[in-house]
Amino acid sequence: MSSYSRAERAPWGDFPKVVRNGDLGSLTNEPEYQAAKQGDAEAALNLVERLISDDTVAQLKTLIGDDKPRIVPVLAVEAAGNNKIPAMMAVVLADRLGLEVETDIVQREKVARTGAGSDHRLAFNPTFEGEVIPGQKYIVVDDTLTMGGTIASLRGYIENNGGKVMAASVMTAHEGALDLAVKPKMLAGINEKHGPAMDAFWKETFGYGIDRLTQGEAGHLRAAPSVDAIRDRIAAARNEAVNRVGASRTATTARAGQQQSPAVKQSSGNSGEDLLQAAQEAETEQQALLESAPIEQTYQQTLALYVQAKHDQVERIEDRLEQLVDRQQARLQQLQSNAPGLLSLPRTKAAWQQQQAQQQARLQTLHTRLDMVREIKEGMGIHAPKIEELATRKMRADDPELAGDWDSMREAARRHQALMRKQEQEKKQAQERERGRSQSLGLSNKPS
C-alpha cells in the first residue's frame, strides 16, 4: 500500500474533448507569463483577457447549452509560486458565459508538475479538497494540458463527490492530447502486452484501474517493456522528488550560514571562509536554476509536441501496414483459389508457383515491417529505440538553440549538486577538526 496521497479518478463515460485556446507552449513567450505563474493576478488577468478567443467561448457555449455549470479552476501551487492563470481564466470565461466561478475546491498539496517529465506526472497526481455541491455541474479549467492527469484527477474528485463535470478547457494544449479518455484500442494493447498485471499494479499503487487513465498516460504504460519497468520508473520519480526536497533544505541551510556573525566566521578560520564562499556560490547557482525554469518548461512542452507527433506518425504507419497486410492476404487467398488443376500444363503450374512465391514473400516483408513498427511503438527490440528517444533526436536537430540552452541548464544543475555535496563534506570536515581541537584542549588543560 502506497503511503502517498491518492488522486481520485472517475469513469470516462462520454466526456467530450477538451476545449483548447492555443497551441502547447504558446504562453511561455508572452510578456506576462512568468509573473502570472508566480502569483501576479493582474498579469494573469491581462494575459487571459487578451488571449481568450471567441471560438473558445463559442465551443464552451455549445457544450453547456442552457445549463449553468460553475467554472472551477485548478488552484495549484507551482514551484515558482502560486499560478494565477487558471483562476483568471475562470474569471474571464465566467464573465463571457454568464456563469459563476467555484473557488472552494482547491488542490491539497504542491506537486510542481509544470515542466516535469512523464514519470513525475505518472507518479504524482494532485489531490483536491473542498465542498462539491451534489448534482451541480462544473467546467474544469487549467492553463496547460500535457498528459491530462491534473484535469482527470480534479474531475474524479468532483464526480466522486456528487458533482458532474460537463467539459474542460485549457489555455494551451497539443491537438492530439485533447481527447482525454483512454481508448479501447489502447487498453487492449496494454492487456495484450502486459496481461492483467499492469491493471493490478495500478490499482494497488494508485487506487484505480487503467481504464481511468488518460490516453496520454496509458500510452506510457503500453510502451513500457514490462510492469517492473513502470514500477521502477514510478519509484525512481518518487525518490528523485524526495532528493529534491533534501537539496532544497540544504540550500536553505547554506543561505542561513551566510548570516552567521563575524565572530563565528573568524573563529572558523580558513574553513569558515571556504564555507562562506561555497554558500555564496550555491546562492548564485540556485538563482541561475530559478532563472532557467522557463527553459525547462519550454523544452519539456516542445518535447511533448514532438513525442505526440511521433506517436501519431507511428500509429498511422501501423494502420497503413495492417491494411496492406490484409490486402496481400486477400490476394494470396485469391491466387490459391485459382490454383492450376491436375491437367494443367507444367509451364502453367510453374508460373503459378512462381507467382505464389512472390506473393508470399511480399506478405512476409509486410509482416516484418509491421513487427518493426510495433517494436518501435512499444519500445522493444534491439533496433527499436523508444519513441521518446526518436522525438528527442528530431526536436534537438530542429531546434539546436533550445537544445543548447537545455544542456547548459542541466550542466548548471549538476554543478549546483556537486557544490552542495562539496559544501556538506567541508562542513563535516570542519566539525571534525573542531572536535579534534576541543579534545586537544581538554587534554592539555588536564592537571598533571
UniProtKB/Swiss-Prot annotation:
Biased composition (Basic and acidic residues): 421-437
Keyword Disulfide bond among record annotations: no
InterPro entries listed in its UniProt record: KfrC-like_dom, PRibTrfase_dom, PRTase-like
UniProt entry keywords in alphabetical sequence: Plasmid
Biased composition (Low complexity): 246-261
Gene3D superfamilies in the record: 3.40.50.2020
Protein name: Protein TraN
Biological source species: Escherichia coli
Gene field: traN
